[in-house]
Structure formats: structure tokens, C-alpha cells
Amino acid sequence: MADPWTVEAHRLFKKHGIKTVGYVPDAGLTDLINACDADNDIKAVVMTTEEEGIGLSSGAWLGGEKAAVLMQSSGVGNTVNAIASIVSSCQFPLFMIVTMRGQYGESNPWQIPMGQATAPVLRSLGVRVYEVDTEEDAAGAIENGLKMAF
């Protein structure tokens, strides 16, 4: 059974007209990725690097569609130049769901530096960040993020 937050996220994608979802495979996003992949109204696009999601999202917008990008916090660093040069300069909307690593209790020390830097880096690029501490808070953050982005 899918996590309740991912069921709600998929419902919100449909409600807000998300037609393209780019993702780098991640265990924390598996249920949402699978829901999008099974949905004939959503183009689910597996990416080889997170940076591709910025171009995918921007291209979808230019083509008249809304997109979402899904990734783990360790991949956010790969998106910095694309966000700064494409999204910020062209004022394209950007909606991302980023699962966090490197937080309290992280067992992999390699995840800690980017996990701690993710929100400040995104904010420094002008990206509005909604941080979620519990699954129950995810739907509200996703809904607000979609409204702000589009």
C-alpha cells in the first residue's frame, strides 16, 4: 500500500494540472513515482541527473504544460547552475519535491553536507522552500508549493 502522503501528492498533481514529472529514482519517492508512471495523463520521465529536471520543467512550461521534478537532497547541488541561469533568468516556474538526507539520525555521513545545505542553497537562488517534518504536513506544503509555482 502506498504511503498516504504520496497518494495525496499524486491527487494534488492531478488537481493542479501537472502533466510531466521528471525524477531520479529514490526509495523515498518510489510510491509517488509509481503512481505518476501508472497515470496515463502524466508523462513520467526518468532522468540520469537532477539537472535534467530543470530543463524538462522549463521545456514543459514553454510547451504550455506544468511539470514537477522529484529528487533526493543529495542531487540538489547538481541543479544550482540550471536554476540560476534558466529558472531565475527566464522567470520559469519550478516545482520540486526533494526528499531529505543528512538530517538528524542520518546513518550515511556522505549525505550530511548536502542535506544541511539544501534549503539554504535553494533559498539563495530565490526558490521558496517549504520544509515538512511529518508526513501529515506534506499535503499542505505540496498544495502551497503548487499554488506558488503556478
Role assignments for model-derived ranges:
Residues M1-F150:
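Thiamine diphosphate
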